[in-house]
Regions:
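An N-terminal assembly and electron-transfer interface module characteristic of large anaerobic redox
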Residues: 1-353
Length: 353
C-alpha cells in the first residue's frame, strides 16, 4: 500500500482478492482458466473473477503487474533475482480468459493495468510504472510516480524488517529455552492458505515455533557467526553467497530456497525443515536433491510436501504432520545437542553471560 497511498489512494478504497480457495475458483474463475500446469498461476483466474464480478462496490482499476525480478536480501551476491517466467507472464495469460469472447473488464467499467516492472532495479521502476499507469490515472506525473515508488520500497523494507525482527525473537527464545523450532522452505505463495494448505499451522498446533525462510533474520552478528568461518576460509565471498551449492543463481526464489537450506543447517535450534512445492513446479524440481542433502548432512530432519495442488488431502496431511511431530519428539533433543556441539563459539542468539 505504500506506493498507492503515496499516490493519494485511500487504503479503504484498495480492494484485495481473498485467500485462494476452491470455492473462489468455481464461482469466479470457471470457464476462464488457461492451459497451464502451474497451479498457483491457474488460481489467478478465481482472483481476477472475484475482483471483477464479486465486489459490492464498483472498481475503477484492476492492477496486476508483470514482475520481472524481485528485490532480495541476496541481491548483489547472486547472478540475478529473476521471477519464474510463468509467474511473470501470468497477468497477460490470465487476462486472455477474460477477453477471449467479450471484454469482461470493459463491461464492468474496469481499466486493466499490468505494468512490466523490474523491482530489483529500483532506478527503472518509476519509469516502468509511469508508462504503465499514466493512461489509467490521468494527470499522473513522473515525479509523483518516482516519489510513490520510493514510498513503496520503504514500506516493503519496513514490513520485511518487522518480520525478521520477530523471527530473531523466536530464535532467541528457542536458544534461551533450548527448544526446537521448524523452518518452512517454500515459495511466497505457499503462505496463501489455499496454496500451502496451512500445513505449517497444523505443525504449530503441536507447540513448535515456525520460521519462514523468506523472513529469516539477517543481522550482521548472526550472519558472521553462522558463515564467518567459510568466508574467511575463502569458500564463499559473503554470508549470502550460494555459489558453493548453486552456481546457476538466476532465480530469486530458487536462490533464497538454497540459502534457506544452508542457514537451517547451521542454526542448532532448527531441528526440522519442511519443504513445500506445488504440482509440477519446473523451477523447484532441480532443487529437491541439493536442498535435502544440505539439510540432512547437518543432521537436521527433512520432510517435503511436493505436488501440492487445489485439493488438501486432509487424511494424508494429518498422517504426515503426526509423523513429523513423532520424529521431533523422539530426536529433537539429540539433534539440538549434536548441532550445538558443532557450532562456532559466541552464538549471538544465546543470552550474554
Amino acid at each position: 500500500m505504500g506506493f498507492l497511498s503515496s499516490l493519494g489512494v485511500d487504503p479503504r478504497n484498495a480492494v484485495f482478492s481473498s485467500d485462494t480457495s476452491e470455492e473462489q475458483g468455481r464461482q469466479f474463475g470457471k470457464g476462464r482458466g488457461t492451459v497451464d500446469c502451474c497451479y498457483p498461476v491457474k488460481c489467478m483466474s478465481g482472483h481476477y473473477g472475484e475482483l471483477v464480478f464479486g465486489q459490492k462496490q464498483k472498481l475503477d482499476i484492476l492492477l496486476s503487474p508483470m514482475i520481472y525480478n524481485l528485490p532480495s536480501f541476496l541481491s548483489g551476491h547472486v547472478a540475478k533475482t529473476l521471477t519464474c517466467p510463468r509467474v511473470m507472464a501470468a497477468p497477460e495469460n490470465i487476462k486472455a480468459g477474460f477477453i477471449k469472447e467479450q471484454d469482461a473488464f470493459a463491461e464492468a467499467g474496469i481499466k486493466y493495468v499490468s505494468p512490466f516492472v523490474s523491482l530489483d532495479e529500483p532506478l527503472l521502476v518509476p519509469k516502468q510504472l509511469f508508462n504503465g499507469m499514466r493512461e489509467a490515472l490521468p494527470g499522473l506525473t513522473y515525479e509523483e510516480t518516482a516519489k510513490a515508488a520510493d514510498a513503496g520500497f520503504k514500506a516493503l523494507r519496513d514490513f520485511s524488517d518487522r518480520l525478521r525482527k520477530k523471527s530473531r525473537e523466536v530464535l532467541e527464545w528457542c536458544a534461551r529455552e533450548d527448544r526446537a523450532c521448524l523452518m518452512v522452505i517454500a515459495r511466497p505463495y505457499h503462505m496463501d492458505p489455499g496454496i500451502g494448505h496451512e500445513i505449517e499451522v497444523d505443525l504449530q498446533a503441536y507447540g513448535y515455533p515456525i520460521l519462514w525462510m523468506q523472513y529469516f533474520p539477517i543481522d550482521a552478528d548472526l550472519m558472521d557467526w553462522a558463515f564467518g568461518e567459510d568466508v574467511r576460509a575463502g569458500h564463499i565471498k559473503s554470508a549470502f553467497d550460494i555459489r558453493d551449492v548453486w552456481p546457476s543463481s538466476y532465480s530469486s526464489n530458487t536462490n533464497e530456497i538454497l540459502w534457506g537450506a544452508k542457514v537451517a543447517a547451521r542454526i542448532p535450534w532448527i531441528a526440522c525443515v519442511v519443504r513445500m512445492s506445488s504440482y509440477e513446479c519446473g523451477m523447484d524440481q532441480p532443487t529437491y536433491t541439493p536442498v535435502q542433502q544440505i539439510v540432512e548432512r547437518s543432521g537436521t530432519l527433512f520432510f517435503s510436501f511436493q505436488d501440492l495442488d487445489s485439493t488438501k488431502p486432509s487424511g494424508s496431511v494429518k498422517i504426515r504432520v503426526e509423523t513429523i511431530t513423532h520424529y521431533l519428539e523422539k530426536y529433537a533433543a539429540t539433534i539440538l545437542n549434536r548441532k550445538k556441539a558443532a557450532m562456532p563459539p559466541g552464538c549471538p542468539l544465546l543470552p550474554k553471560a
